[in-house]
Amino acid sequence: MSNIIKQLEQEQLRTDIPAFAQGDTVRVQVRVIEGGKERLQAFEGIVIAKRNRGLHSAFTVRKISNGEGVERVFQTHSPLIASVELKRRGDVRRAKLYYLRNLSGKAARIKEKLN
């Protein structure tokens, strides 16, 4: 029984999502349906958390909008996500960057990773 479930989940995994990590700046294009129209809405920010659970994987993106911190959790393999674009690689030493919630301004910046 579990083999059937694994096979069905494997078919639904997306392969068009780029490899990104915590600290990276990404732009997520989300399909939004308003009334009868569908449009794309961009959400750009820093990935502060990533949860790898196969089909149930998720990541949290944080941005500052009008001086207010906004966080949004996206399901990695959701059909509502049109695309994920990697803007900038960040150099961090933590798996979860929840400490950024308490920082503001220049203190909340993340060093860029130079390969």
Swiss-Prot record:
One of its GO terms (biological process) is translation. GO terms for molecular function: structural constituent of ribosome. Pfam families: Ribosomal_L19. The keyword Ribosomal protein applies. Keywords: Ribonucleoprotein, Ribosomal protein. GO terms for cellular component: cytosolic large ribosomal subunit. Coiled coil: none annotated. It comes from the Bacteria. Belongs to the bacterial ribosomal protein bL19 family. This protein is located at the 30S-50S ribosomal subunit interface and may play a role in the structure and function of the aminoacyl-tRNA binding site. PANTHER family: LARGE RIBOSOMAL SUBUNIT PROTEIN BL19M, RIBOSOMAL PROTEIN L19. This is Large ribosomal subunit protein bL19. It comes from Tolumonas auensis (strain DSM 9187 / NBRC 110442 / TA 4). The lineage of its organism: Bacteria, Pseudomonadati, Pseudomonadota, Gammaproteobacteria, Aeromonadales.
